[in-house]
Amino acid sequence: MFFGLILQKFWHTIDHEVGAGILRLRFNCSEVMKMLNIVLVEPEIPQNCGNIARTCAATGARLHLIRPLGFDISDKAVKRAGLDYWHLVEVIDYENLEDFFARNQVEQMWCLSTKAPRSYTEATYQDGCYLFFGKETKGLPEDFLDAHRDSCVRIPMRECARSLNLSNSVAITVYEALRQLSFPSLTDYGKMRG
């Protein structure tokens, strides 16, 4: 809600305790939209997390990490994959899903799963919605999917393929949500030389 009320541009810096260290997060609070929320439930591969952080930086999405993680957030592979975009990403971590729901008021959520009956393009994404993605090897927990059955969507693919890469799935879904919202606060034009 705080981000939706910001009308003038300023930078905000927070210190976030991660394990034994402090991760300094600096992000631009100039956006007037609530922003999308990417929720990674027990991600295992640091490079995926870094790539997803870069997608968040480019789109203004907030990144939520649900523990246990398969890596240390300060891992070099995470930082390398996110390049020099970390200062543009708001990252919040949680002990578990219960901790996440206790700390967030989720008005709309979509759970991405290969088991879902309908396509992610059939969903109507609202500003501030939460997009849940499971761990690379197992996806979201079955009981979680059962509890949120009406919010489950999938990315279509060939039947012989098990799944898409996690960071690719996040990017595909985030950009569909942003397309439906008319790419708020994003530059959708460029200038070619010559």
Question: Language-model segments: which ranges?
Answer:
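Post-transcriptional modification and biogenesis factors for structured RNAs
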Residues: 8-19, 23-194
